Amino acid sequence: ASPATAGAYCVMDAQTGEVICQKNAYTRMEMASTTKVMTALVALENAPLSLTVRITRAEAGTEGSSMYLRAGDVYTLEDLLLGMMLVSGNDAALAVARTVAGSEASFVRLMNEKAQEIGMCDTHFDNPHGLHSQEHYTSAYDLALLCGYAMQNAEFCRIVGCKSADIKELTSGETRVMVNKNRFIYAFEGADGIKIGYTRRAGRCLCASAGRDGKRMICVLLNDADWFASAAELLEEAFKNKR
């Protein structure tokens, strides 16, 4: 099976790291909001979920997809991670980065160190949200490696597997519901995460994870207009062949 529509894809056995099938998997590409997989992982490894975060004016005004944070709002790190992974809040990504590392630049350094540690040889991060930058790229293979690694983190798993979550602004006590924009988790048997992304330049990007019969498969698609159908086709095939 080879979804012709994808710029690149990589299907990986999460347990062994074996590449089941791929297309252009080692080509450097733009990744859009799938960046936030690394943002969430670095945050989870470096700060407690209960940490409280006060939102700045700059963060509240971030361009692109948003969880609509307002300056002065206070949230737990956990709720910001939910907003970042479920509705792809760029505002949340910046607030998380500043809180965890002191500044966006310091956080990005942590992202790149982690990428090296995992063995992501064709990846460089320039920001925590994935908006376009010349210096911000990955490959389908590298992202699949990252997803396999991240899904070993129980908190990460729980967050990206949420179909929806109630988040609470702590000064007002006001709660809102965040519904996961990653439709793949509703559509594919065994699907349990991870993240979608889209910019005009990167196209539609999807990192998907699914578990069946004790096996976990990761599927990464970059620049694929038919992302959900392609992922379903590739993962079905992978599970069939791994029986």
Show the residue positions of the predicted features.
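Active-site-adjacent loops and short helices of periplasmic peptidoglycan-processing enzymes
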Residues: 1-141, 147-154, 212
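Domain-terminus/edge residues, biased toward the C-terminal soluble/receptor-binding domains
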Residues: 120-121, 132-137, 141-243
